[in-house]
Amino acid sequence: MERELSNVSVGDVTAAACPEDLVRAVRAAGVRDERVLRAVRATPRAGFVPAAHVAHAYEDVPIPIAHGQVTTQPSLSATMIEGLRLTGVEHVLEVGSGLGYQTALLARTARDVVGVDLWPDLVRAARRNLARQGIRNAEVRVGDGGQGVREHAPYDAVIVSAAFPTVPAPLVEQLRPGGRLVQPIGTGGREEVVLFERTVIGLEPRQVLTLASFVRLHGRFGYPS
């Protein structure tokens, strides 16, 4: 029997908790982009977490999911998305979609999103969760995130939600010149979340957005699964 990863009703959450709690946390983390804040407000995280953790859906904390993974803390997702400086017209690649919450935020701030995750059960759950929220401009597929999704390239922006000491070469190749990429750089544990830009000479670091702890990037261009 397939394990149900995230299929809770928003009504199952205590009435005192709501997306506005996360909006306050995101503001407190320094995010000022109103489009990102509106996306957080419009996206019920309770629809994207395992049933066992729904009581914590509107706390600004990572939540454990299958395969030893955790969801990205909402304020950290918002910080990374703000770093991409999306205007609503971008074609975005997301590496590490999890259960789809960050995918939903991206879908509400970009033109469309292609998400990729290594585990089929997570991808199935993310697709269900996004469909229940009526989000139709996001596609999530199974794959090795470090290899990107070449058939939908080039991308205007890439967001990587797992750590590795370098940016995988396929992600650089699939990023449009002038495009932006955000990735935690490190071995998994405590990383610099770095904003890069692709220029005529290659991928150049522009800014360290924050420090944070991430799971490791697995796959051909990451750590062995």
Model regions: which residues?
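Conserved nucleotide-cofactor-binding alpha/beta core module
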Residues: 85-205
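Class I SAM-dependent transferase core
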Residues: 2-95, 101-105, 109, 122-136, ...
